[in-house]
Amino acid sequence: MRFSKVVKVGDVLLGGGNKIAVQSMTNTRTADTDATIKQIRELEGAGCDIVRVAVLDLSDAAALKKIKDGIGLPLVADIHFDFRLAVAAIENGADKIRINPGNIGGENNVTRVLDCAKAHGVPIRIGVNSGSVEKCFLNSYKLSLIHISEPTRP
């Protein structure tokens, strides 16, 4: 069996010999806390272990505190374009954040997010897509990325 590091997201352990956790994402406006809590409770009833919400502005980030109080699942904040949203999400109780370092404004901003996450013990999922990778890197690594993404066949 391949070794993997255990990461704690709320009270759910990922990796190592732990069971596979089911994660889903809401499609409500996160600042609409009543609708978001209702949908998360439905996801929990369907067997979801972790839930992710979009944090598009500071009102979404501020809503995380109320949402956390109304649910029993670990809460992941999906951050786009602004490092301040990541910091606010962590400070409002996110159990994990998902960022794309290519679109939150440079190394200094990424460092600020990392420092905040470390101070609060919050893990970060790094999600990068080709739209946020500088063209010179994309062209240099395109072939190897295609090779990596191809499934291995026996």
Predicted ranges, named:
Residues 25-27, 54-58, 80-84, 100-104, ...:
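Active-site beta-loop-alpha junctions enriched in small/polar residues
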Residues 144-154:
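Residue-level detector of conserved catalytic or cofactor/ligand-binding positions
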Residues 1-24, 118:
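N-terminal amphipathic alpha-helix/helix-capping segment at the start of soluble metabolic enzymes
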Residues 19-35, 54, 73-81, 137-145:
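Active-site mouth loops of central-metabolism enzymes
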Residues 27, 32-33, 44-66, 101-106:
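Glycine-rich, proline-tolerant flexible connector loops at the mouths of alpha/beta enzymes
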Residues 84-125:
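Hydrophobic or amphipathic alpha-helical targeting/insertion segments
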